[in-house]
């Protein structure tokens, strides 16, 4: 399959995201009137019960150590929007330096991870998974720390859910989101 990296990046740079229909597998661009953002400032909240795991040595963090395994982990659900075509797109974006995996490990075991796309100072979180309890939560906290250190200004989680709300996620309307996204696209940041 030939992937048009430029066209894919243009879609993300306009605030859209790709999803496959769970039943047909057909891929389409989706937009939302409000984007769920993970704050990269003092509004981010690490739940108290998670803090010992974040500070401890239970999980080790790696970047892009097992990208394809993270994609597979994110797709391994009874109903998934990550089709085989979308997996190939993620791999092409990864090979081009735009898609990344942020992983938690226990020894040689991939415990969990987050899949996302970095464009300028924006990180668009596509999906996350875990195989060991709390692994994806620790990955989220450590990813926020990493993005802060690298100068990122936007962590787009796309759609709100109660899990993200526990970490301080908030909704931003489309117009404000577009303005922030366009600012971030002009700021060079290196993810890894």
From Swiss-Prot:
Listed Pfam families: Leu_Phe_trans (PF03588)
Species classification: Bacteria, Bacillati, Cyanobacteriota, Cyanophyceae, Synechococcales
Known function: Functions in the N-end rule pathway of protein degradation where it conjugates Leu, Phe and, less efficiently, Met from aminoacyl-tRNAs to the N-termini of proteins containing an N-terminal arginine or lysine.
Protein family (similarity comment): Belongs to the L/F-transferase family.
Leader peptide range in chain numbering: none
Lineage top rank: taxon: Bacteria
Keyword Protein transport: no
Keyword Protein biosynthesis among record annotations: no
Localization annotation: Cytoplasm
Gene3D superfamilies: Leucyl/phenylalanyl-tRNA-protein transferase, C-terminal domain
Name of protein: Leucyl/phenylalanyl-tRNA--protein transferase
Catalysis: reaction(s): N-terminal L-lysyl-[protein] + L-leucyl-tRNA(Leu) = N-terminal L-leucyl-L-lysyl-[protein] + tRNA(Leu) + H(+); N-terminal L-arginyl-[protein] + L-leucyl-tRNA(Leu) = N-terminal L-leucyl-L-arginyl-[protein] + tRNA(Leu) + H(+); L-phenylalanyl-tRNA(Phe) + an N-terminal L-alpha-aminoacyl-[protein] = an N-terminal L-phenylalanyl-L-alpha-aminoacyl-[protein] + tRNA(Phe)
Gene Ontology biological process terms, A to Z: protein catabolic process
HAMAP family: Leu_Phe_trans
Gene Ontology CC terms: cytoplasm
Key words, A-Z: Acyltransferase, Cytoplasm, Transferase
Documented EC number(s): 2.3.2.6
GO MF term (any one): leucyl-tRNA--protein transferase activity
């Amino acid at each position: 399959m030939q992937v048009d990296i430029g066209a894919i990046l243009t879609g993300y740079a306009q605030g859209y995201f790709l999803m496959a229909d769970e039943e047909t597998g057909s891929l389409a661009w989706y937009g939302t009137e409000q984007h769920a953002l993970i704050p990269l400032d003092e509004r981010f909240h690490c739940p108290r019960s998670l803090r010992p795991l974040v500070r401890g040595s239970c999980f080790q963090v790696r970047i892009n150590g097992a990208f394809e395994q993270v994609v597979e982990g994110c797709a391994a659900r009874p109903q998934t929007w990550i089709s085989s075509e979308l997996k190939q797109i993620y791999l092409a974006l990864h090979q081009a330096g735009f898609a990344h995996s942020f992983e938690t490990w226990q020894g040689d075991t991939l415990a969990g991870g987050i899949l996302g796309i970095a464009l300028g100072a924006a990180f668009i979180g596509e999906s996350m998974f875990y195989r060991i309890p709390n692994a994806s939560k620790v990955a989220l906290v450590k990813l926020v720390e990493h993005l802060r250190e690298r100068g990122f200004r936007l962590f787009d989680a796309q759609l709100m859910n109660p899990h993200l709300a526990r970490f301080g996620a908030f909704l931003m309307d489309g117009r404000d989101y577009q303005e922030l996204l366009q600012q971030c696209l002009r700021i060079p940041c290196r993810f890894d």
